[in-house]
Amino acid sequence: MARTVVLITGCSSGIGLHLAVRLASDPSQSFKVYATLRDLKTQGRLWEAARALACPPGSLETLQLDVRDSKSVAAARERVTEGRVDVLVCNAGLGLLGPLEALGEDAVASVLDVNVVGTVRMLQAFLPDMKRRGSGRVLVTGSVGGLMGLPFNDVYCASKFALEGLCESLAVLLLPFGVHLSLIECGPVHTAFMEKVLGSPEEVLDRTDIHTFHRFYQYLAHSKQVFREAAQNPEEVAEVFLTALRAPKPTLRYFTTERFLPLLRMRLDDPSGSNYVTAMHREVFGDVPAKAEAGAEAGGGAGPGAEDEAGRGAVGDPELGDPPAAPQ
């Protein structure tokens, strides 16, 4: 029986690494996994994990693939010896944290290129063959930051919101082609993601006003607390990917945690967005500015009990490690 061929981007660490070895070591021995990395010099941890799980010979291969480079994507596709990819996992991503005015133009461009355009490049490379064959699955690493805005994650959230629109639009089209696309919506995850977050807190004060600077460090403290309380292990998240992969009738979205669903329901229940904005501000910063309170009284803002509905500690950065320490 032919094995299911899976290609995963972003496998040097975190979710990509753990998903790759989870599939390669599956007792069914039904998967052939191509774990791709931007730099093959970083594959050591992947192979250590593969040995620890006793992945059978031939179940796992590594390929160089940089989602920022169409030629690199095409070259990786050509090195898949089976001549097809049954399951494509778009997992590579970058983060960017800080006040918007403090972010460099190159850093902003990098996040959008990797998170959005990089995913488009992968889909352009692999979807046509899936459509021709009338079968295939695409799993995209989504985020609660793609479903609700998080302060100081403006560009990161913008990139993940873009993925939501991209994937939802494609899912509508792909129904008659026999190709299923699912977003795996992650909350905080114990990974090295923060090491890849572009932007240094030490540079923030020179690029923003003192009030925003103060709010930024309020956010960092809050984020660290949420991470301690709510972060999942990548192994746990990998199981959600496996659930989506094996589902007879996959849905568009799978959530790795239910912790953020009350806030998401709040957004849906109030299309104006006022309730969510006020509740999120209160949740992160512990206060509601007078202007926001006045707006709520005028009609539609978050009233008493909105904080309880959202749930304390229900806000955090998707796939973030401990926030950087405040400069001394």
UniProtKB/Swiss-Prot annotation:
Residues 291-328 are annotated as: Disordered. PANTHER family: 17-BETA-HYDROXYSTEROID DEHYDROGENASE TYPE 1, RETINOL DEHYDROGENASE-RELATED. InterPro entries: 17beta_DH (IPR011348), NAD(P)-bd_dom_sf (IPR036291), Sc_DH/Rdtase_CS (IPR020904), SDR_fam (IPR002347). Changing L150V: Alters substrate specificity. The keyword Lipid metabolism applies. CDD domains: type1_17beta-HSD-like_SDR_c. Pathway: Steroid biosynthesis; estrogen biosynthesis. Favors the reduction of estrogens and androgens. Converts estrone (E1) to a more potent estrogen, 17beta-estradiol (E2). Also has 20-alpha-HSD activity. Uses preferentially NADH. Substrate binds at S143. The modification Phosphoserine is found at S135. Changing E283Q: No effect on conversion of estrone to 17beta-estradiol. It catalyses: 17beta-estradiol + NAD(+) = estrone + NADH + H(+); 17beta-estradiol + NADP(+) = estrone + NADPH + H(+); testosterone + NADP(+) = androst-4-ene-3,17-dione + NADPH + H(+). One of its GO terms (biological process) is estrogen biosynthetic process. It comes from Homo sapiens. GO terms for molecular function: 17-beta-hydroxysteroid dehydrogenase (NADP+) activity; catalytic activity; estradiol 17-beta-dehydrogenase [NAD(P)+] activity; estradiol binding; NADP binding; NADP+ binding; protein homodimerization activity; small molecule binding. NADP(+) binds at residues 10-38, 66, 160. Keywords: Cytoplasm, Lipid biosynthesis, Lipid metabolism, NADP, Oxidoreductase, Phosphoprotein, Steroid biosynthesis. Homodimer. Exists predominantly as a homodimer but also exits as monomer. Its EC number is 1.1.1.51, 1.1.1.62. Changing H222A: No effect on conversion of estrone to 17beta-estradiol. This is 17-beta-hydroxysteroid dehydrogenase type 1. It is found in: Cytoplasm. Pfam families: adh_short. Changing S143A: Loss of 17-beta-hydroxysteroid dehydrogenase activity. Belongs to the short-chain dehydrogenases/reductases (SDR) family.
